[in-house]
């Protein structure tokens, strides 16, 4: 993002070994960027760290405050590239993983960003399979699609209710479970008459498989960082989760589906758009 902001060719970041064209940029003025401010006002850009760990993660780490604490903290920024930072005031290590766009509603048939009409939370009755949806927007807002936090809840609830197995395949039939001509299952969250768009809102086995890959990338990145410093999840005192995937994440559900490490829920903190805050 820093490259695009200052108009520098970002090609090097896309090609192995993924080295940014610059790390720090000094002497930049508002006039250089045509910003609506005093043209001589200096502009500071959060420095790139390396590879896919850019200035947004520098800003997010600053906002999280983990750099100024004695306790060991984990900072997770959920997006198309998932970035992880681990450490305390003595050291910080980071890595990036290709999680794909599932956390932001991409690669999901009814996915969307966390805007009006997005299903951001869900519970499912184990007996009737009826879902209870929390939707972004006014109280009478009908669902339009599913955002990242909603996907986490839905998959966790489907697994808890025995509707899908650990591979994300539908193993229980019911009024909310439908199958296409090829036998692929889907769970209907809102029928055509219940949605804002007049189209069915559902989550299918391909959606679930895409999400399993995304959450697996995040968990693998966390394990990679911990292994690099010869530590286990027991060393984690705080977990800060960022990303524009909803107004909040049900951390228990995220742990249940193997997306986050199994630590005490009190250690989790959702901090929203940390890049903007930083």
Identify the role of each PLM range.
Residues 75-77, 169-173, 234-242:
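Beta-strand segments within the central parallel beta-sheet cores of soluble alpha/beta enzyme folds
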Residues 8-26, 44-47, 59-150, 250-272:
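Glycine-rich phosphate-binding loop of actin/hexokinase-like ATP-binding domains
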Residues 57-60, 212-234:
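Phosphate/ATP-binding catalytic cores across multiple sugar-kinase/actin-like superfamilies
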Residues 35, 52, 56-63, 212-216, ...:
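Glycine-rich phosphate-binding/hydrolytic loop that grips phosphoryl groups
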Residues 28-51, 56:
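Conserved catalytic cysteine-centered active-site region
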Residues 152-214:
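Gly/charged contiguous loops adjacent to phosphate- or pyrophosphate-bearing nucleotide/cofactor binding elements
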Residues 70-73, 129-132, 222, 229-234, ...:
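Non-transmembrane, aqueous-exposed alpha-helical and coiled segments at domain scale
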Residues 1-4, 233-253:
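Glycine-rich phosphate-binding loops at beta-strand->alpha-helix junctions
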